[in-house]
């Protein structure tokens, strides 16, 4: 499953600019226990931002809910409304690209603006036939 953050951004812009503006404000994202002593258990970042002229998108609703709980900073009614709109758009079948990967297929995507996911699958019992996936990050040095 693939979905463009630009598409979501522009749909929210058309539907409710005030809610889009809220998504440019910072939210607490839970670090899921991956922090050192003395560090914050959350990252405080916006969902949408433009960085170096490019749209960047970060969103995991459960990380935001947990992050605000950890920081004891409840989400406002308008923040919840903005996140609900975002949740609905990320499930909109009209804007999701579905692609059935075949053995040997390779996918490259930019995690800063392409949302990605997968549907459920049943794996083989035979170790030689089990699903294999190699995930790597390629850094753009420009």
Listing of model-derived features with the role each one plays in the protein:
Residues 1-103, 108-142:
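Active-site environment of non-heme Fe oxygenases that use a 2-His-1-carboxylate facial triad
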């Amino acid at each position: 499953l693939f979905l463009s953050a630009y598409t979501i951004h522009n749909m929210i812009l058309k539907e409710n600019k005030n809610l889009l503006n809220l998504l440019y404000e910072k939210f607490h994202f839970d670090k899921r226990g991956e922090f050192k002593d003395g560090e914050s258990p959350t990252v405080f970042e916006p969902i949408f931002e433009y960085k170096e002229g490019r749209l960047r998108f970060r969103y995991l609703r459960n990380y935001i809910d947990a992050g605000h709980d950890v920081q004891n900073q409840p989400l406002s009614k308008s923040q919840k409304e903005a996140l609900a709109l975002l949740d609905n758009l990320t499930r909109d079948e009209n804007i999701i690209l579905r692609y059935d990967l075949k053995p040997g297929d390779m996918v490259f995507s930019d995690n800063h603006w392409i949302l990605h996911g997968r549907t459920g699958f049943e794996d083989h019992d035979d170790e030689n036939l089990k699903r294999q996936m190699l995930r790597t990050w390629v850094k753009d040095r420009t």
